[in-house]
Amino acid sequence: MESGTVLLESKSSPLNLLHEMHELRLLGHLCDVTVIVDYQGVREDFMAHKAVLAATSKFFKEVFLNEKRADGTRTNVYLSEVQVVDFASFLEFVYTARVRVKEDRVQQMLEVAEKLKCLDLSETCLQLKKQMLESVLLELQNFSESQEVEASSGPQVSVTPSSKASVPAGEDAHSNGLVDSSDYPIERLGNGLSPETPSKKCKEKLDKKKDVAKPPFPKIRRASGRLAGKKVFVEIPKKKYTRRLREQQKSAEEAAKNDKCPQDQSPDNERVEAEPASKSEACPASVEREESLQKVEGEKEEEEGKDGEEKKKSNFQCTVCDKAFLYEKSFLKHIKYHHGVATEVVYRCDTCGQTFANRCNLKSHQRHVHSSERHFPCEMCAKKFKRKKDVKRHVLQVHEGGGERHRCGQCGKGLSSKTALRLHERTHTGDKPYGCTKCDAKFSQPSALKTHLRVHTGERPFVCDECGARFTQNHMLIYHKRCHTGERPFMCETCGKSFASKEYLKHHNRIHTGSKPFKCEVCLRTFAQRNSLYQHIKVHTGERPYCCDQCGKQFTQVNALQRHHRIHTGEKPYMCNACGRTFTDKSTLRRHTSIHDKNTPWKSFLVIVDGSPKNDEGQKTEQPDEEYASPKLSDRLLSFGENSHFNNLLEVQGNVPAVQENSSTDTACKAVVSQDALLTTSISALGELTPQTVSMPAHLPSLTNME
């Protein structure tokens, strides 16, 4: 028996698929295209998936199918004709099939959909506009009917041959926003016909003329009666709407001329203004709307003429709607609320590059910080300041005893405010109320906790423009930049040495003062720097966190591990420029330089060799300068005083083991040097080289004094 087939269909799968793709885009996962939207200086990058964009937009589909790129590289698509806010809404619609926008932006979204060829979004916008238009037309129809009912139930207008239609006392004809009914087209009556009884044919033609002149979508701003004070807006593009009304108005005027009744051709010169009593109920709506439209269009033409004059005087002009503005603030507000372009104005100081929230703060900064003018003097001591608040602070702290009012009771330090004093007192009490939620660290200030949290999050917001190095704190970036500029603004007054940071100078001054404020609680040994104390404490605790991956030896400091690694690799990056010998660390080189000259600073002998290779063949490390040649043994001896005793030195064939300059328990690594290095290796080797009849100079052991 054959089994039938069944259909497995999930109604929620499409929605779930869209939801998951939307989540992936928000997290930036699996995105293979970056859409860069740059519109009138406002730029933003959007990450997305090619498959989703190509499936919903024919524009992106054509771009992706025609592109030629290398595998593994992300595609960049540049859009300059779409606003950032509109493309963000477009992306949300593509990934969620729905987006919420303001009513006045529906037309913009329709234009974006047409540019990007997104049929789904285009159909959605058109359907929504149709619904909006139908609702507005229905409201206008109800409004028109209510106006006709009110007009029919209102008082009758008396007609006189010599004047226009009168208005009831105390009521302004234009107070309700409608055009006066006296402007209604007049009828010329003759052949003995009285004004009160016009011919039936003329009345019929008059009705036709009114019907033709009545626009289908009248634009009425305000209404009288029950709806007075309410505004009715029709969401139709202005240019198309006004053009359509003008065409209908012209056609209505032509029809009115062609359909004039025979009585209009009468030679009778008597002109009578009349309004048939039988038509008094049907006249108000259509004719008044036509008159109101003519009035509105006349006002628009006057406004356009005024706008043309203002544009000549204006400094800022909108490229979207050609509206001109005299001030930048008004222009920015216009493009933000009417076109959705949220421009980010950056107020940056040209001198120091600092940015500010508004123009006022920038002007204040330029006026007070970069200006040497001091217009605000102190009345007590005549000292001048740049700002008034600086004078107030000066008077408060200096003349009114502000320093004594905020002075620490334990150390006597004066603080500028109570808040600063309270924070300072925590250094004495040890109070640390701000604790980290991810570790046991505690801090006395919230700013210190915020900086500490970057250790857990990995955030390094401060980036160096030169090398791309990132830092957790701004002052660390400032110190780092001085490595590139070579700036050392902090100089020691004792020895004249300069430093890049104030902290380094503070540590250096302890060399001259002999201050060692950090004491070990175990052995009572004192140190000049806190970091040195931390390293020393590991001696008591036995902690050796740094382990060699080749021999397993452990160290308390990372730089000690780095020096130890050079024993395995044979790297000797530090060379003595007097004898050409190389060393694994600077401390050994410093001790070695005392052989040559104790009075000369050891750094004058230092030469750093980049990428020093391992010396497998017993030759010295390669010199950094190709023209530099290692001097011969006899030449090197003659370079020192009283070395004439060694003129008869014998050359020794072969190589001898050299003394290790680094004390280490690892005896597996041996270094082999040539006979040119015998002089500075061991005293015993020199004893073999020297003839027995010649006595060794007394100063020679100092030349070969090693570690």
From Swiss-Prot:
PROSITE patterns: BTB (PS50097), ZINC_FINGER_C2H2_1 (PS00028), ZINC_FINGER_C2H2_2 (PS50157). Signal peptide: none annotated. Residues 149-221, 243-309 are annotated as: Disordered. GO terms for biological process: branching involved in ureteric bud morphogenesis; negative regulation of DNA-templated transcription; negative regulation of transcription by RNA polymerase II; regulation of DNA-templated transcription. The modification Phosphoserine is found at S612. Keywords: Cytoplasm, DNA-binding, Metal-binding, Nucleus, Phosphoprotein, Repeat, Repressor, Transcription, Transcription regulation, Zinc, Zinc-finger. A zinc finger (C2H2-type) spans 316-338, 347-370, 376-399, 406-428, 434-456, 462-484, 490-512, 518-540, 546-568, 574-596. The keyword Zinc-finger applies. Residues 149-165 have a biased composition (Polar residues). Disulfide bonds: none annotated. One of its GO terms (molecular function) is sequence-specific DNA binding. InterPro entries: BTB/POZ_dom (IPR000210), SKP1/BTB/POZ_sf (IPR011333), Znf_C2H2_sf (IPR036236), Znf_C2H2_type (IPR013087). Residues 198-213, 243-278, 287-298 have a biased composition (Basic and acidic residues). Belongs to the krueppel C2H2-type zinc-finger protein family. This is GDNF-inducible zinc finger protein 1.
